[in-house]
């Protein structure tokens, strides 16, 4: 039997995941602030602003701009809001979400200023117990999922039964979820790989080849694994779909906003110019400084994140960024 599921945020990924949930037989309500998007989804089953490639969304998807109406009957509430705005947006839903509902985060990022993961931000904002929070992460490029190309993901919750409930609610013929209790690992994977994707994209945009890209990806994986382990994550998580899988997809596709943003930087655009071309800032941009700060907090070296921070804040070139990665003593891998 299908569930009542609300998706907060009708961007490309939120809408694409809403379609997955609808295809799985659930009744889906999208919540958006923009009245134009609400009316488009509700009246025309289309999201021309954020996901124009899908001509018709399923009939069991609707939309509203009213917060209370959006969540009043929800069994599951999915959060697909830009990570850096999550806390401000979610506070408005405190006290509105039913006590039995599981809250699921699709967000990937570290909150700037607090260095907190999205699970911490969501739980603090909604005063939510750990067993009612779940996160979803994996190699999930929204355009491909919107086109119903086969894909897999990972659902993490400290309560395995609740992780399974969420996984069952988003299982379709083309979308396969796996479950884990390693929320910290999943959150760290989803957040930190965006910094690596920026760096790989920048190298590609500057004209560097496979060796350079492979070096950045591999060292980026080592960096995020070390950070995750220091934060209490299971290192195995970083070598599954949420880690290596997401890294491969994000670092190798022009569909990835982080990769594309980095590529534009590599071609010589400034951060401001790349933001305009990308129609917004990629999540990896505000996350980069937070990763550096988190590394300092956990006493874990973050050379790649540090060099990307210099790119974003000081405007150094790709060649200078790469030179910075080589300016260390010889160590074991």
Curated annotation (Swiss-Prot):
Pathway membership: Membrane lipid metabolism; glycerophospholipid metabolism
Main localisation: cytoplasm
The protein's annotated catalytic reaction(s) are: sn-glycerol 3-phosphate + NAD(+) = dihydroxyacetone phosphate + NADH + H(+); sn-glycerol 3-phosphate + NADP(+) = dihydroxyacetone phosphate + NADPH + H(+)
Where on this chain does NADPH bind? 13, 33, 108, 142, 257, 281, 283
GO terms classed as biological process: carbohydrate metabolic process; glycerol-3-phosphate biosynthetic process; glycerol-3-phosphate catabolic process; glycerophospholipid metabolic process; phospholipid biosynthetic process
Record's PROSITE patterns?
Answer: NAD_G3PDH
Tell me the InterPro entries matching this sequence: 6-PGluconate_DH-like_C_sf, 6PGD_dom2, G3P_DH_NAD-dep, G3P_DH_NAD-dep_C, G3P_DH_NAD-dep_N, NAD(P)-bd_dom_sf
Q: Does the keyword Cell wall biogenesis/degradation apply?
A: no
Q: Which GO terms describe its cellular component?
A: cytosol
Q: Which residues form the active site?
A: 193 (proton acceptor)
Q: Does the keyword Cytoplasm apply?
A: yes
- What biological function has been recorded for the protein in this entry? Catalyzes the reduction of the glycolytic intermediate dihydroxyacetone phosphate (DHAP) to sn-glycerol 3-phosphate (G3P), the key precursor for phospholipid synthesis.
What the entry lists under NCBIfam families is as follows: PRK00094.1-2, PRK00094.1-4
Indicate what this protein is called per its UniProt record.
Glycerol-3-phosphate dehydrogenase [NAD(P)+]
Source organism per entry reads: Bifidobacterium longum subsp. infantis (strain ATCC 15697 / DSM 20088 / JCM 1222 / NCTC 11817 / S12)
């Amino acid at each position: 039997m299908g569930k009542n599921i609300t998706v907060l945020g009708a961007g490309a990924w939120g809408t694409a995941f809403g379609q997955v949930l609808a295809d799985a037989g659930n009744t889906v309500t999208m919540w958006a602030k923009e009245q134009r998007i609400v009316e488009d989804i509700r009246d025309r089953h289309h999201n021309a602003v954020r996901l124009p490639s899908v001509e018709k969304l399923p009939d069991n998807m609707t939309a509203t701009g009213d917060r209370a109406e959006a969540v009043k009957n929800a069994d599951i509430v999915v959060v697909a809001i830009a990570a850096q705005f999550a806390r401000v947006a979610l506070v408005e839903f405190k006290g509105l979400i039913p006590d039995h509902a599981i809250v699921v985060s699709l967000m990937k990022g570290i909150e700037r200023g607090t260095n907190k993961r999205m699970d911490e931000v969501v739980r603090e904002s909604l005063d939510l117990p750990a067993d009612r929070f779940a996160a979803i992460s994996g190699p999930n490029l929204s355009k491909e999922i919107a086109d119903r190309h086969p894909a897999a993901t990972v659902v993490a919750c400290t309560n395995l039964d609740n992780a399974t409930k969420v996984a069952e609610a988003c299982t379709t013929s083309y979308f396969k979820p796996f479950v884990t209790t390693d929320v910290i690992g999943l959150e760290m994977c989803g957040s930190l790989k965006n910094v690596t994707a920026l760096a790989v994209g920048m190298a590609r945009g500057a004209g560097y080849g496979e060796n350079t890209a492979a070096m950045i990806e591999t060292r980026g994986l080592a960096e995020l694994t070390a950070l995750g382990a220091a934060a209490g994550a299971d290192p195995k998580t970083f070598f599954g779909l949420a880690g290596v899988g997401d890294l491969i997809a994000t670092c190798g596709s022009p569909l990835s906003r982080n990769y594309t943003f980095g590529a534009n930087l590599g071609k010589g655009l400034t951060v401001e110019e790349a933001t305009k071309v990308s129609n917004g800032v990629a999540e990896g941009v505000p996350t980069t400084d937070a990763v550096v700060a988190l590394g300092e907090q956990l006493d874990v070296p973050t050379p790649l994140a540090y060099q990307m921070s210099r790119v974003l804040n000081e405007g150094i070139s790709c060649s200078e960024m790469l030179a910075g990665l080589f300016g260390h003593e010889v160590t074991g891998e």
